[in-house]
Amino acid sequence: MFEATTILGYRGEFDNKKFALIGGDGQVTLGNCVVKANAIKIRSLYHNQVLSGFAGSTADAFSLFDMFERILESKKGDLFKSVVDFSKEWRKDKYLRRLEAMMIVLNFDHVFILSGTGDVLEAEDNKIAAIGSGGNFALSAARALDHFAHLEPRKLVEESLKIAGDLCIYTNTNIKILEL
């Protein structure tokens, strides 16, 4: 259940305009059975200034969302400070260290992966990040499309997630996308 989804975050500049998008599939899997095909695993936070998405246990992810949103509010939307404080708080709490979820959070300037161990990882290129069972498929597709095609950002996210959905049995092509 920990990896059974695909979430893709993408930020940058297109035609001299900054963008930030997050997309995810809608499949919820319990063991080897699909129990829902249209779940929403992405959210807009802090007055639509930060995007987030999760992979993993739904109950754990909602706990993480709530905690991260509280910290983000206290830091007045400063994403960098929020992820650092989030990681510190996560590592101090025995309960949180056992949560089986990962998150991507991003804005116009940063893309971070928050791991199940409390680690904060900035995307290698600070542009594209993916998590979940189809994450590597989506990440590879997004990097290739970003490098070789001049696609609108929304189309790039959609096509990358479709490729992941075609290859990963825990990911479907019922795609939801949010953008700043």
UniProtKB/Swiss-Prot annotation:
Its EC number is 3.4.25.2. Na(+) binds at G165, C168, T171. Gene3D superfamilies: Glutamine Phosphoribosylpyrophosphate, subunit 1, domain 1 (3.60.20.10). Keywords: Allosteric enzyme, Cytoplasm, Hydrolase, Metal-binding, Protease, Sodium, Threonine protease. It is found in: Cytoplasm. One of its GO terms (biological process) is proteolysis involved in protein catabolic process. One of its GO terms (molecular function) is threonine-type endopeptidase activity. Allosterically activated by HslU binding. InterPro entries: ATP-dep_Prtase_HsIV_su, Ntn_hydrolases_N, Proteasome_sua/b, Proteasome_suB-type. The active site is at T5. Its main location: cytoplasm. It holds the Pfam family Proteasome. It catalyses: ATP-dependent cleavage of peptide bonds with broad specificity. One of its GO terms (cellular component) is HslUV protease complex. It comes from the Bacteria. Protease subunit of a proteasome-like degradation complex believed to be a general protein degrading machinery. Belongs to the peptidase T1B family. HslV subfamily. A double ring-shaped homohexamer of HslV is capped on each side by a ring-shaped HslU homohexamer. The assembly of the HslU/HslV complex is dependent on binding of ATP. This is ATP-dependent protease subunit HslV.
